[in-house]
Amino acid sequence: MNIRLSAAFLSFAAFAGLAAAPSAQALTINPIFDSTVTSSTYVAQIENGFRTAAAVFTGNITNNATININVSWGYVAGQSLGTGGLGASSAYLYTNLPGASIQYWLTAAAASPRASKAESGSSKYLAAAVQADSAYKFALPTAEAKALGLVNPVSTALDGYIGFGKYQPYTFSGAVKAGTYDFVAVAQHEIEEVLGRISGISSANPSFLTPFDLFRYTAPGVSTHSYSALSYFSIDGGATKLAIFNNAPYGGDRGDFNGAAADVDNAFLSAGQTDNVLQDDFTILDVLGYTAIPGANTQPTPTSTQLIVAHLDVPEPGSLPLVAVGLAGLTLLARRKRAS
């Protein structure tokens, strides 16, 4: 059985100014396990599995930022995942931002001495992508704002929520057993979405875009925000296809991939399947403003799935979709709900 993944959003109406960052250079993911986790029979497995999932990011990203994530079992941001969900995420966003600001911040990050070749090279294509999407305002995840140094990077405020479906069979560590889902993989998918790997394209007429949407192409030099068109992730203006985005007619996040490679960012996860955190995943975070260690360790950690509570169309036969919930103006807004 495959499961679809997706993301949710919490939004802030205003954006804070530039904040000074302490000297230490290390990403910290701070999980806050709520009572749904601490009261579960699987509390130790959930907590250990989540920390294992987070370690691949904290061990390979050097930005000085602390990302605070509320972790729930059976719920996400207070909403039940029901009986069919694997995982879900919801991120806080700074909203109503002009594309020119996103371009400026990403370009500044790319000019940093700490920027990778991928990040530095990608910035030259941002102006054209922003121009192509000039009709839209942008939303910036608070976690990404921390990585870019735009707000206090060690703020204790929540950056997002992640929840895991409690009715699915999981393998919490080691080789994934037949008929079970890889918990670490699900967690990694969700964590990366809170960090910023999300799309604002939730319908044919999106209300906003995200920085990640600036790296979406249908052909060399042709940016897109289409919900249905076959599109791909590229950091060189569309010349090179690094991964194909999900455009399944039965749903799935448009910021996820279509499953052509065994990637943690895939929109669907099958029971018994082990996907991996690949180099392309670090490239995504790199161009979004994070700094990955050169040759970041892409150890064979199972792909993680992201599921958010929202309206989800009936998935393909034998598949479970992971979907996203939207939180607008600090109000939980259902975008898609996953069917089981």
Each language-model region and where it sits:
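Bacterial N-terminal signal peptides that target proteins for export
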Residues: 1-10
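Extracellular zinc-dependent metalloprotease catalytic-domain scaffold
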Residues: 26-188, 193-310
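A short, hydrophobic C-terminal helix/tail in secreted or cell-surface proteins
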Residues: 316-333
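Short, charged juxtamembrane terminal tails flanking transmembrane helices
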Residues: 337-340
